[in-house]
C-alpha cells in the first residue's frame, strides 16, 4: 500500500534528523576544547538537542495543510 508523502516533508525530516545528531556532538566537542568540565559540555549539548527539537516542532506546526483541509471539506 503506497503512501503519498510530500518530498518537502521527507527533506525536513532528514534535515532535522541530521541536525539532531550533528549539533549536540559538535557542541559537546567544541565546548570541551575550551573547558575540561564535561558536565558543562554535556549540558550545552543537551541544550542544543532540545533547540533542534523545538525547531522541528515549530516547523511542523507552521507546515501548510491547506490540501488536507480542502479534501476534508469535499467529503
Swiss-Prot record:
Lumenal membrane side: 30-41
Topological relation to the membrane, as annotated: Multi-pass membrane protein
Pfam family, one: VMA21
Keywords in alphabetical order: Cytoplasmic vesicle, Endoplasmic reticulum, Membrane, Transmembrane, Transmembrane helix
GO biological process: vacuolar proton-transporting V-type ATPase complex assembly
Topology Cytoplasmic: residue spans: 1-8, 63-75
Subcellular location(s) per record: Endoplasmic reticulum membrane; Endoplasmic reticulum-Golgi intermediate compartment membrane; Cytoplasmic vesicle, COPII-coated vesicle membrane
Family matches, as InterPro entries: Vma21 (IPR019013)
Cellular component, GO, one term: endoplasmic reticulum-Golgi intermediate compartment membrane
Transmembrane segments: 9-29, 42-62
Functional summary from the UniProt entry: Required for the assembly of the V0 complex of the vacuolar ATPase (V-ATPase) in the endoplasmic reticulum.
Family according to the record: Belongs to the VMA21 family.
Protein name (Swiss-Prot/TrEMBL): Vacuolar ATPase assembly integral membrane protein VMA21
Species whose genome carries this gene: Vanderwaltozyma polyspora (strain ATCC 22028 / DSM 70294 / BCRC 21397 / CBS 2163 / NBRC 10782 / NRRL Y-8283 / UCD 57-17)
Organism placement in taxonomy: Eukaryota, Fungi, Dikarya, Ascomycota, Saccharomycotina
Annotated gene: VMA21
Amino acid at each position: 500500500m503506497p503512501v503519498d508523502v510530500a518530498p518537502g516533508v521527507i527533506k525536513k525530516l532528514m534535515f532535522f534528523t541530521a541536525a539532531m545528531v550533528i549539533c549536540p556532538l559538535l557542541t559537546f566537542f567544541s565546548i570541551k576544547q575550551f573547558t575540561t568540565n564535561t558536565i558543562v559540555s554535556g549540558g550545552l549539548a543537551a541544550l542544543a538537542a532540545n533547540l533542534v527539537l523545538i525547531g522541528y516542532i515549530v516547523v511542523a506546526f507552521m507546515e501548510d495543510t491547506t490540501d488536507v483541509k480542502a479534501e476534508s471539506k469535499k467529503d
